[in-house]
Amino acid sequence: TKGTQEIFNRMMNDLAEVSGYSELEHIPVVPVGHSAMATYPWNFAAWNPKRTLAVISLHGDAPRTNLCGYGGENLEWGRTRNIDGIPGLMIEGEYEWWEARVNPALAFRMMYPESCISFLCDTGRGHFDVAGQTADYIALFLRKALEYRLSGHPSLNEPVRLKKLNPKEGWLA
């Protein structure tokens, strides 16, 4: 959408100014979505890959799912926008497990082999609860994303350069 990047940048700049944390102008983002809004983080990453550290879809959907939450077709997906090299984690509870939710993610990985989507079954959990172990796993996922994607020692006053991961080199959470 026209002007969206400028609106996002203004929002982050305003937040940096109001909060006193100037680094908010440039830090990488980890979009998180749950349930029907769990396609949001995939779409954010495709729209702004240089700013996306990692993606978390919690008890939600795959990128470009045919189920609820995806919304209208984003014609730019696959042409000018993708999530190649950005680590993504799709988490489903054991008691909400549904192949119709996983199959679009597997198909996406086949269509976009440079995407780095991993899956986690939240054992013993349903749609609205999360185990402490799952929270620990998400924290580990984010630590590893920082470790492998940050290049050098980023300055607080300039955009962070993120390395693109290659799934052929072993990236799966």
Where are these regions (language model features)?
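Alpha/beta-hydrolase active-site loop
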Residues: K2-E23, P31
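Stable alpha-helical elements in mature extracytoplasmic
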Residues: T4-M11, M37-Y40, P104-A105, T134, ...
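Surface-exposed acidic, glycine-flexible loop patches that form ligand/cofactor-binding
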Residues: V18-L24, W77-N82
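Short beta-strand immediately N-terminal to the catalytic nucleophile in serine-hydrolase-like folds
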Residues: P31-G33, L58
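The feature captures the conserved acid-bearing segment of alpha/beta-hydrolase catalytic domains
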Residues: L53-A139
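Short glycine-enriched nucleophile-adjacent loop
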Residues: A38-P49
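Alpha/beta-hydrolase-fold serine-hydrolase catalytic core, especially in secreted/extracellular enzymes
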Residues: P113-S115, T123-A173
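Soluble non-cytosolic domains of exported or imported proteins
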Residues: K2-E6, S35, E99, D129-G132
